[in-house]
Amino acid sequence: MNVWELRSGWVDSFAPLIVADFDNARASLLISDGLPKEWQKPPSVEFLVEKRSKKQLPRADVPALVPGALALSAKAKDALGAFLSSFGQILELDCRDEPAYYFNVTNIVDCLDREASTKRPDGSIIKEAFLADRVPSEPSVFKDPAKARSRIYVNRAGKDAIERIVAEAGLTGLEVGDPGTA
């Protein structure tokens, strides 16, 4: 395999970020479609607090937020920011609890093999196959136009770089896995 999905992992082990003061217009700012974003005011987010539970889930350095985007703690931004910023924007979120950032991938690579991918009866792709000759060879984090709203991909060199940074910084919550298996 030459392409993996980059995502927040362990949603049952760490508290996710949620949109605070939900407003459809503000929440729509978090839709990740591969296009650059310019926020007049950052969307407000907060960590989910389970009101019925005395023991809260710990906070990850890369908490779950929305599909196709990554939320980063200050620690994750400091560790991964230089690498990730080559492939998109790192935007500040208005987080009530602690500094948080939104990684918006704007690097688009059309490399999905639509014919070889596994599809639902309606034609939507559930398990991706890739055209190896279109996948970048240099370290890369990217989106394919067909799955831009729901997936972030990374190639072998990018996977190796991210895994090294995550291990060196001791980051939690980031997962590099097979596409379509989360």
Name each model-derived stretch.
Residues 5, 89-93, 173-177:
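A structural signal for short, well-ordered beta-strand segments and their strand-loop junctions
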Residues 21-23, 55-63, 106-109, 128-130:
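Short low-complexity stretches enriched in small and charged residues
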Residues 31, 51, 96-182:
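Acidic, proline/glycine-rich low-complexity IDRs
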Residues 37-65, 69:
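A glycine-rich, hydrophobic loop/mini-helix early in the fold
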Residues 25-36:
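Short catalytic helix/loop segments, enriched in acidic residues and glycine
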Residues 1-26:
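Short, extreme N-terminal leader segments that mark the start of a protein/domain
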Residues 56-102:
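Short, well-structured hydrophobic secondary-structure segments
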